[in-house]
Amino acid sequence: MQNLFDSRIEKLQAQMRKDGLKAYVIPATDPHMSEECTAYFARERFYFCPFKGSDGTLLVTLDGYFIYTDGRFWTEAEGDIKGSSCILMYQGKEGVLSIPQYVKQNNLYPLGLDKKLLSRQELAAYFSDDTHEIRQASYRHMVDDLPELPHDKIFKIDDSLLSTTLEERIKNVLEDTKEHNADALILPLLDDIAYVLGYRGNDIPCTPVFYSYLYLTAEGEVTLFIDKERLPLDFPSFIRVLPYEDFYAFLETRKDIKTLIDPFRTNAYIASLLSHPVFAPSPAFEQKSIKGPVEVRNTKEIQAIDGIALLKLQKYLLDTPIEEIDEYKARIFVDRARRENPRCFDLSFETIAALDDNAAMMHYAPSETNHKTADKNSQLLLVDSGGQYYGGTTDTTRTFLIGKEISEEVKHDYTLTLKSQIALSTTIFEKGCSGHSLDIKAREIMWKEGLDYKCGTGHGVGYMSCVHEGPIGFRFYDRPNRLDNGELKPGHIITVEPGVYKPHKYGIRLENNLLVKEAFTTSDGIFYSFETITYFPYDRRGIDLSLLTDEELQWLNDYHKMTEEVLKPLCPRELLSLLEDLCKEIKR
């Protein structure tokens, strides 16, 4: 019997031949350049490709189909595409051509793609000369049972949870717009819109945004493109509201106005409509990444609440016989533990709960029908999880040592990961540094032993928003269109999550959230440091003390002391002794 995906691809290829196309590209995004998107936009790639991971672009030619994804997903993708004719392209690996390079080298023109799903910069990579014909194309209509766009009501963030008012945020983005000599501003990024307006939605799982476009003029005219029935009764009356689907027609009437758009975060179709585009970074993109005093205070509060949910998971794992621990039950348990707190209104991403060899797949997520159960030889359970709270967004990873015996290799790699995290967390750096400047602090410890993790060391975190937020990140290399090489500034929140991944064996990751803050000023400059704002102890069974320096051991004990102090006031009585035990001083 023919593979289901191969059959679908053959039908797509037949239609491409009729339309005179040699290739077709399906990105994993939507017209707003979202990292995660609603099913209406995501379904096309999942329909034609067996790879289940969230980040991957499909290239379909007349004689094959290729899924491009980065090192976070390679092991998962290798398993997903078995039995199909889909070919995995190891994106980022030396010698592997990018999609534009592959298209050019093989002269796959005319090329079909939806210009609403690529940024202006991404689209430009496919052109070398006028012979490279690119046609506007979409085959989403071939997908069976394509869902509608979401219709749920959006909701307002309480003013007490924000450091700025709606009027101040509008004023700030327009001031930046005027500085670039533009007369209007288009905000297509959903989290930019949510930030400026102070509203949130439920359109994308685990990401509280809503499908819309925001158009602002230098004179203060504000127009939101969204279905009006989705708005609450108290929505500001000075904001003009037009239907979501009217945005492009509206833009045709304003095309001669000098309009600021972000070339990396605005789809190419929007850019093509404007006669006088002003290309500059989105003002909201930078402004929303810097948390004010209210956001910082609230984030620390919900990080403590989050720590209690993980403490409940720790108790569950300790009380459950090892042969009864399974990934799906652990995932459901920690998800429920978070949601028990009234401030938690959603998860911040699909929980990763991975035993042993499954933990080597960085973004593996168990399901009710596809999960693993521990056995007597199991050693570890990696849990990467987070919540959306009224007051912030969390993202924490701990690797729980569940085995009766823990191998020296696992202890070594766990301790190496801890050392890597400590090294970056304790860095002092001068104003002007980006996360790319500092990434080596974490990675050098791994490199000295010939190890490396095929992903960034960390990413910015939003506030009741995207768990992955620019313009900051820790990595030593530039990732096309990731745009995370921004300068680190006080108020930024960023993760640090090094790891060791040994395919088909095990994976270890430890992840904390860091707050950038001012450290001191000297005659030579202004210096910054990090404050760890994740509160949950490490598993001492995984720590090889012979590998820790005295300074690292002191940091670990100080961190555990702080964690106990922060969590104790919130800790249920039945978990108090466990918290004290997990946080007690570690001595050589």
Question: How would you name each of these model-derived features?
Answer:
Residues M1-R588:
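Active-site neighborhoods and metal-handling regions in enzymes and metal-associated proteins
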